[in-house]
Design a protein with these regions (language model features):
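A solvent-exposed beta-alpha-beta segment
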Residues: 30, 34, 38, 57, ...
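Conserved Rossmann-fold NAD(P)-dependent oxidoreductase catalytic core, especially the SDR/UDP-sugar
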Residues: 260, 376, 382-383, 387-439, ...
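Strand-loop microenvironment adjacent to phosphate/nucleotide-handling motifs in alpha/beta enzyme folds
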Residues: 282, 287-291, 444-636
Length: 636
């Protein structure tokens, strides 16, 4: 039984050895040493002493066995030589070194002394030719892969970046048998690399040469293989690429380069985040972490775009418990599933369904779980929809905020952070006006909380603040997903007005700054924190760049159609009202707007009247709101 098992094991190993390659190696080794002997005697066979011919016949079998065994031990018969590179070359060197040690051992065993040149020339030739035949196979494979006729090529590719990521992309294109594509040229900002080659592909110039090279090689696809470049640099290169009619794709990020997953299948189309060119926001992670750690955190609207990202970033900071509260069970379920998969039992995660309009539900949750921090993200945010359903904006946004804030005071919550919007500044729509009322509510509640604590002789009170920012990319109400769908459908791409501008920020950026602002709120309670959204973006320009970077020409392949401003929409957004002033913080991306003085008692009376009007579906709700928010002038 053991004999059969041993035989089976040997046969299995033999199966992994290329017999044909081993025979070829044997012939090369025998020929190399014989050739070395002929060189020693000036290619006159008759001059060779019989001692040397007999010695050659005696040792060559040993040399062949030793070389073949070494090549096998270093897996050179198992390598896929079509993809051979430095790794295989290094292993060939190791195999040759150990083989030469074997040659020395054979000499001491047999005591057959051959000419010194026999060992040197024979050894070098055997290494050179056994290695050469392997890399010749690779060269022939590359020639075969790149022997596709230009007529058969569908994608004519330019790679931007001559670094590791660029090389990986080029190699994959070269070795792929299924892609009808070819990399024609590379560009890199390092001028020293120009006129050099990567795997036979010429580095033709720098970023300024992209348009000319695209025309020269009839390029229809540009790949950005510069994951470690600053966002600003990537944006500048994209600006150049957008002047061509090429489709532009990019590697997702430097992580793919670090973990070795740079691949054609991981390429993605250029997104608006790339066009913004914003570098990563700076936040004090240690201070934020200490602020969140071991606290019970409640996130209302925790399944929404902002709320779910708040949950993700809070979960990273080791809270005592994280409570996801949302009226939409589907949204809450998906973020719950994501966080459970990532953190398992290490995160105390509670997912609850309910409405911020239901005071009893809020009381029961706060009574049971006793949150330390509340991030209030639950809100209706869609401007045109709220114009048609203004009473719902009041019920959910305004009264919902009042309910959560009131419950927070009564249940001794330490910090309350409202997620607001720049549409609350001089609002032209009911959604923005409702969010301005929310800001006024939390400023009133901050004063109330402070006053109640003083009356009771307490130093601890609920500190309220709001964080105001503009449009976030990827949110449910963002225009960007609409643009993408319209481009995929062949157009038209609809823009409300040629001159409309907006501030944009990614959701993770916005939430990171929200958490930083929440930390500052320990000192600046009652204030509105305003996030720096960078430079404003012209929506028309953004739409046209997205079309170009998708490989189409605006107004030729895909129409850009202007539909007119929607109800409640304005051409530009503002960050602060004049009366709020502007105070800087240690984080240059966060500023502070101070509360505008108001009569809290009068405001409460107005709130009660507003609630009654909304609950009775008053047709005059917008006019009532305008009496409370003087800068809001309804259009109808």
């Amino acid at each position: 039984m053991k004999k059969n098992s041993l035989l089976s094991s040997i046969l299995n190993k033999i199966q992994h050895v290329s017999i044909a390659m081993a025979l070829l190696d044997a012939a090369i080794i025998a020929g190399s040493y014989f050739f070395a002997l002929m060189i020693r005697f000036d290619f006159h066979y008759s001059w060779i002493d019989r001692y040397y011919t007999t010695g050659y016949a005696s040792v060559i079998i040993w040399y062949i066995l030793i070389d073949v065994i070494m090549l096998h031990m270093f897996h050179l018969y198992q390598s896929v030589w079509k993809f051979a590179g430095a790794y295989e070359l290094l292993r060939s060197v190791y195999a040759w070194i150990f083989a030469q040690i074997g040659v020395v051992i054979v000499y001491f065993i047999t005591r057959i002394q051959m000419p010194v040149s026999f060992y040197i020339i024979g050894g070098l030739m055997s290494f050179g030719f056994t290695t050469m035949v392997r890399f010749m196979y690779r060269a022939l494979s590359v020639f075969k892969d790149y022997g596709v006729s230009d007529e058969a090529i569908v994608e004519r590719v330019m790679v931007v970046g001559a670094g590791a990521a660029g090389r990986e992309i080029i190699q994959e294109y070269m070795h792929s048998t299924s892609l009808k594509a070819k990399v024609f040229c590379v560009v890199d900002d390092d001028a020293r690399l120009v006129k050099k080659y990567i795997n036979g592909v010429p580095i033709e110039g720098t970023r300024e040469d992209i348009p000319d090279l695209a025309n020269k090689y009839d390029i229809n696809k540009i790949i950005l293989a510069i994951p470690s470049a600053p966002k600003r640099v990537q944006k500048e290169i994209l600006e150049v690429c957008s002047s061509t009619s090429c489709r532009v794709q990019t590697i997702p990020g430097v992580y793919q380069l670090l973990n070795g997953s740079v691949s054609i299948k991981n390429l993605r189309d250029v997104d608006v985040e790339d066009l913004l060119g914003r570098d990563t926001v700076e936040t004090d992670l240690s201070k934020i972490g200490n602020f969140i750690k071991d606290k019970v955190v409640l996130v209302t609207g925790g399944g929404g775009s902002i709320g779910s990202e708040l949950c993700r970033q809070v979960a990273e900071k080791q809270p005592k418990a994280l409570i996801i509260f949302d009226i939409f069970e589907g949204n809450a379920y998906w973020i719950q599933l994501e966080l459970k998969r990532k953190y398992g039992s290490s995160l105390n995660l509670i997912t609850l369904i309910g409405s911020v309009r239901n005071m009893s539900r809020l009381d029961s949750i706060m009574d049971e779980y006793k949150p330390d921090i509340i991030f209030h993200a639950a809100a209706h945010k869609h401007v045109p929809l709220m114009e048609d359903s203004p009473n719902e904006a009041i019920k959910n946004n305004v009264m919902g905020t009042y309910n959560v804030a009131d419950a927070a005071i009564r249940h001794n919550v330490k910090w309350f952070v409202l997620i607001s919007t720049d549409k609350a500044v001089n609002p032209t729509n009911i959604m923005g006006a409702s969010k301005r009322l929310c800001e006024m509510i939390i400023q009133m509640m901050n004063r109330r909380s402070h006053r109640l604590a003083q009356e009771k002789g307490l130093t601890q009170y609920t500190k309220f603040s709001a964080v105001r920012f503009g449009n976030v990319l990827g949110s449910s109400g963002s225009v960007i997903p609409l643009f993408k769908k319209q481009i995929e459908a062949g157009g038209p791409v609809t823009v409300t007005d040629k001159n409309i501008i907006r501030y944009f920020m990614t959701i993770p950026e916005a939430v990171a700054l929200v958490l930083q602002a929440a930390y500052y709120a320990q000192e600046y309670d009652g204030d509105v924190f305003v996030l720096d959204m960078g430079d404003p973006v012209k929506i028309d320009d953004m739409a046209r760049k997205l079309i170009r970077l998708s490989g189409y020409i605006p107004d030729v392949d895909i129409e850009v159609k202007y539909t007119g401003l929607r109800p409640g929409e304005k051409l530009y957004e503002e960050r602060l009202m004049d009366e709020e002033g502007m105070q800087t913080t240690e984080n240059k991306m966060i500023s502070i707007g101070h509360p505008i003085s108001m009569d809290d008692d009068e405001f409460m009376v107005q709130l009660e009247e507003l609630e009654k009007a909304a609950n009775s579906e008053s047709p005059n709700i917008k006019q009532i709101v305008s009496n409370m928010v003087p800068t809001y002038v309804p259009k109808d």
